[in-house]
Amino acid sequence: GNSVLFRAFYATSFSNIMKTSFGAYTNAVYAFANMLNKALKMVEPDYCCVAFDKGKATFRHQMTPDYKAGRKETPVELVEQFGLVRDMLNAYNIKYLEYDEIEADDIIGILANKFEGDISIFSSDHDLFQLIDDTKHIKICCMKKGMSDIGVLDEHALYAEYSLKPY
């Protein structure tokens, strides 16, 4: 959720940021919805779940106090859109998960390793590349070029594109 929403915001904020007639920012929600629809059509999943960071300190902050210390504050124009995206997911009847002390990528990792079958993870977060596993049928669908292009990475494609192995 977070990585796609951030990408949606920055991919659409270079020009006029979209707002409703009453002033609510919607550019990231609009782009997120478009990407979600594209992903759902591409994969046609039996189940779908979106993972969010809660924005609070996690166990990693306890281990390394300066974890993510250099990050800029999230723009207020984007902060306001997180609730709208959650509302949209509820309207789509798509489950979303967020937990104190656990980041979204950890939630994704837990779910990917818990379930069997073809698992497609939509994210631009390269940290998730480590989850790619051809034997477990786990692949990453990465957003490229803003929000318009989706590349699918399995073990072969990961090595061909980045000279990396997931484990």
Predicted regions and their residues:
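Non-catalytic, usually N-terminal nucleic-acid engagement modules in DNA/RNA processing proteins
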Residues: 1-49, 53, 59-60
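Extended two-metal-dependent nuclease catalytic cores across DNA- and RNA-processing enzymes
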Residues: 14-19, 69-167
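Glycine-rich loop at the start of a catalytic domain that most often binds anionic cofactors/ligands
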Residues: 61-66
